[in-house]
Amino acid sequence: MSNMEKHLFNLKFAAKELSRSAKKCDKEEKAEKAKIKKAIQKGNMEVARIHAENAIRQKNQAVNFLRMSARVDAVAARVQTAVTMGKVTKSMAGVVKSMDATLKTMNLEKISALMDKFEHQFETLDVQTQQMEDTMSSTTTLTTPQNQVDMLLQEMADEAGLDLNMELPQGQTGSVGTSVASAEQDELSQRLARLRDQV
């Protein structure tokens, strides 16, 4: 097995591992959603909110893993092409010895240009691999947008057939719905302010 074939194997393996990680995160998200429903049914909104944050985090992680898996898979496909073309060139080299006449008519400039393209592709491959590593490291620090948490809480309450406002303990009534509405109101206010500034 050549170095390039080993590299290809490692890329394909990495793509599968990333895909497995995405599926694991999907399972974790579903488990957290089930915990949200139980917490809402018990009227424990603080615990429900924690599970909602965890569920959103797992969902975001799953998307990131899936995206990276696709990128690594795309890079692996490029390497596969390069490895295959390398093999074709070697097999051609054996045949070429008996093809002096054909060799004499070959355009060396075109061969040289083709080699340059190969080298450039592998340089690009290295850059993309580095970008992939940088992206993966940056996605490990994930924040959980509160409006997503609020929306998920409402969705889980709806699925459980509960009215959040009715089931909430005294003093917390309507906190989820209100915070979503106020967040939307804040966003509208900011948009209006930006429009005024532009005029």
UniProtKB/Swiss-Prot annotation:
| Phenotype when changing L192A | Abolishes interaction with VPS4B
Keywords assigned = Cell cycle, Cell division, Coiled coil, Cytoplasm, Endosome, Membrane, Protein transport, Transport
Q: Where is it made, tissue-wise? A: Widely expressed. Expressed in pancreas, kidney, skeletal muscle, liver, lung, placenta and brain.
Q: How does it sit in the membrane?
A: Peripheral membrane protein
Effect the entry attributes to changing E184R: Abolishes interaction with SPAST and no effect on interaction with VPS4A
Chain positions covered by the region annotation Disordered: 167-199
| Principal location listed in the UniProt entry | cytoplasm
**GO cellular component term of the entry, any:** nuclear pore
Residue ranges of the region described as Interaction with SPAST: 174-199
Q: Where is this region: Interaction with IST1?
A: 132-156
Q: Where in the cell is it found?
A: Cytoplasm, Cytosol; Endosome; Late endosome membrane
Q: What result is annotated for mutating L192A?
A: Abolishes interaction with SPAST and VPS4A
From the UniProt entry, list the residue stretches annotated as the region Interaction with VTA1.
180-199
> Region Interaction with VPS4A, MITD1 and STAMBP: which residues?
180-196
Motif, MIT-interacting motif: chain positions: 186-196
Q: Where is the composition biased (Polar residues)?
A: 170-182
An example GO BP is:
midbody abscission
Highest taxon, organism lineage: Eukaryota
Q: Which GO terms describe its molecular function?
A: identical protein binding; MIT domain binding; protein domain specific binding
Which region ranges are annotated with the description Interaction with VPS4B? 183-199
What PANTHER family does the database record attribute to this sequence? CHARGED MULTIVESICULAR BODY PROTEIN
Query: How would you summarize the oligomeric state and partners of this protein?
Result: Probable peripherally associated component of the endosomal sorting required for transport complex III (ESCRT-III). ESCRT-III components are thought to multimerize to form a flat lattice on the perimeter membrane of the endosome. Several assembly forms of ESCRT-III may exist that interact and act sequentially. Interacts with CHMP1A. Interacts with VTA1; the interaction probably involves the open conformation of CHMP1B. Interacts with CHMP2A. Interacts with VPS4A; the interaction is direct. Interacts with VPS4B; the interaction is direct.
Q: Which family does it belong to?
A: Belongs to the SNF7 family.
Instruction: Give the function comment from the record.
Output: Probable peripherally associated component of the endosomal sorting required for transport complex III (ESCRT-III) which is involved in multivesicular bodies (MVBs) formation and sorting of endosomal cargo proteins into MVBs. MVBs contain intraluminal vesicles (ILVs) that are generated by invagination and scission from the limiting membrane of the endosome and mostly are delivered to lysosomes enabling degradation of membrane proteins, such as stimulated growth factor receptors, lysosomal enzymes and lipids.
User: Protein name, please?
Assistant: Charged multivesicular body protein 1b
According to its UniProt entry, this protein's organism is Homo sapiens
Ranked from the top, the taxonomy reads: Eukaryota, Metazoa, Chordata, Craniata, Vertebrata
Encoding gene, per UniProt annotation: CHMP1B
